[in-house]
Structures are given as structure tokens and as C-alpha cells.
Amino acid sequence: MTSGAAGAIAHAVRCVTKPGDEVLTFAPYFPEYNPYINKSGAVLKVVPADTSSFQINFEKFEEMLNPNVHAVLINTPNNPSGIVYSTETIKKLASVLEKKQEEYGHEIFILSDEPYREIIFDGVDAPYVSKYYANTLSCYSYSKSLSIPGERLGYVAVNPAAKDADVIVAMCCQISRGTGHNCPASLPQLAVSRCMGKTSDLSVYETNMNIIYDELVKLGFEVVKPGGTFYIFPKALEEDSIAFCEKAKKYDLILVPSDSFGVKGYFRMAYCIDTEKVERSLVALRKFVKEEYNM
């Protein structure tokens, strides 16, 4: 057990890398990965995005793979794009890494960041990474599925088929003492143990997503439809997404520019709010687009 998915990643990276090793992740990515990885002594490097689908950009990924890469950090369903990596994508990732392990003569671990695992929309293919790749460490948080983000409760799950799985589990038990990511308090652990296999009502997220997606398309935004999470990641109406989001503030719209996610020219919208608030926000969005961009 760890203090959320952040603690899980902090543990996992220290188990499978040493200082100076490279960890690859894929844009768009959660910006806090930088301190999680770099503070461990490993070095985070970011593979450019495939903005047509926000699936993995395999051409750029294979260009960046080298013998110093010891881990690949993925996030599916993804923050900020809302995209879920397909079974085809995960199978291809596994195939590439299996070949590179053999070529380089060492293991390459997937660190699978999965806090949004239960927030999957109807009909979306959402594979478990560990089913397709033995050297997988799954990093999970209960904060999204049970709507308890402040409780900081998660875990690292080591695939039993992973190389030296028993050693990695033992390492996780010791790492807490050195990182400050101590085990969560016993009371929330006890509470969550009584909620296993359950979630809060997550259906509102898909309702909100469909409302926002349809409106964005109607207004002329370029956007890939999310398959999960409570985020959507449209292309901004000008190249400078920071300027775009600053203008939106005048209309009481809080949008997050994409620069910190490793992509230029996009922005993130979150819709983990009541549907009534989503509908009211669209009135402001229409006004913003009309007055600032004549659309």
C-alpha cells in the first residue's frame, strides 16, 4: 500500500532503475512525473505525441529507445487527453520492448499509472497492461474510483511473472522509509477494504463528456473524443495555448494550457462537476469563442 499513485510511482521507479538510467514517457503526460522520476536519480525523457489519436507515437518511441532505457512510464486512461490505449497499442508496445530487452541484455519495465482505470466509457477497449507484458508494475490509486482523493491511498502491484518479482515486492516494503511516502494510515485502509470491487457513481463523467464533446465539435474545435477519465483535450483556437487560456479567464473559464503536458497548442478541460455546472459553463464558452475568435 502507498500514499496514492504518486507514492506508488515513487516506489516503482526506485525498484527498477538506478541513478542515470532513462525512463521514457509519452506526451501528453502528467507533469508531476518530472519530480517523481528525476528525484529518484533516473532521468525522464518524453516521447512526442501523435496528436491525430493520442495513442503511442511508435516512430518517435523507437527512435528514442536506447540501452540506457530501463523503464517506460505509461498512463492509460490518460491525463490530460482522456484517451485509453487500445489492446493493439499495448500489444505493439509489449512486442517492441520484448525485442529491445533481448537486444540490450537487460529488463525494461513498464510502470503503468492507472488511477483512472474504472472511469471507462461505454464500449471502449481498456486492456490490462500486465496481461500483455510480464515486466509490468501497476500503480493505482483509489482516489478516482471511490471519489476520495484526499485520503492518499494506493498501491504498487507487481506482476508475478516479472523478473525478480519477489525481490521487487521486498524492495517496495523498504523504500517507504527513504522516500517519505510511508504507508497510508490504517483507518482509510480499513475503510477501503470494505469497498473492494465497488466504485462511487462514475456515470456522470460520461454524461458530462458527451455534452462537452458535442458542444466543442459544434463550435469548430478539433478534439479527439475521450474514452475515459474526466478530462478532454481540444486544440486551442490559436497557437499560443497559454494566451488562449488567459483570455478564457475573462469569461470565468478555467482551462489548463497544454505546454506543461508536453504538447503545444492544446488545452485541458476537466468535467468532474455536476452536469448543471457543465451546462452553465458552455454558455460562457460560446460567448468566449464568439467574442474572441468570431466563431
Range-by-range predicted roles:
Residues 2-295:
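PLP-dependent class I/II
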